[in-house]
Amino acid sequence: MARVTVEDCVDKVENRFELVLLASHRARMIAAGAPITIDRDNDKNPVVSLREIADSTLTPDDLKEDLIQSLQKHVEVDEPESEVVPALSSAPQNPEAIGDIQFDRMTEEDLLRGLEGLVPPAETEDDSE
């Protein structure tokens, strides 16, 4: 039965590897409780999914889109962008003020004293494995 079903499906999905991906995804959907669009006839889920594809009760494009969506970990949402993004507002407006910026200086001895005061975090059970 499966050989005949696969031969019927090749007309709908030309690439056999893609057919396997789509049919296995549909079989997992059926196992998860998705409604079946044809009579089961005591067939297992992979055969039912192949028969659904062969009978065109499900379109391969819809299955492909559903498969891609199920594999995505992050769905990108288009958000409207603000019309004008202000430049760094904290930057000085006139170029002469750039030379007046002060930076804190630290000597190597100050850095070493600061590092000596740091305490490593306590080891947890997860770290020891």
From Swiss-Prot:
It is an enzyme of class 2 (transferase). It catalyses: RNA(n) + a ribonucleoside 5'-triphosphate = RNA(n+1) + diphosphate. One of its GO terms (biological process) is DNA-templated transcription. This is DNA-directed RNA polymerase subunit omega. The keyword Nucleotidyltransferase applies. InterPro entries: DNA-dir_RNA_pol_omega, Pol_omega/Rpo6/RPB6, RPB6/omega-like_sf. SUPFAM superfamilies: RPB6/omega subunit-like. Residues 77-98 are annotated as: Disordered. One of its GO terms (molecular function) is DNA binding. GO terms for cellular component: DNA-directed RNA polymerase complex. Its EC number is 2.7.7.6. Promotes RNA polymerase assembly. Latches the N- and C-terminal regions of the beta' subunit thereby facilitating its interaction with the beta and alpha subunits. PANTHER family: DNA-DIRECTED RNA POLYMERASE SUBUNIT OMEGA. It comes from the Bacteria. Belongs to the RNA polymerase subunit omega family.
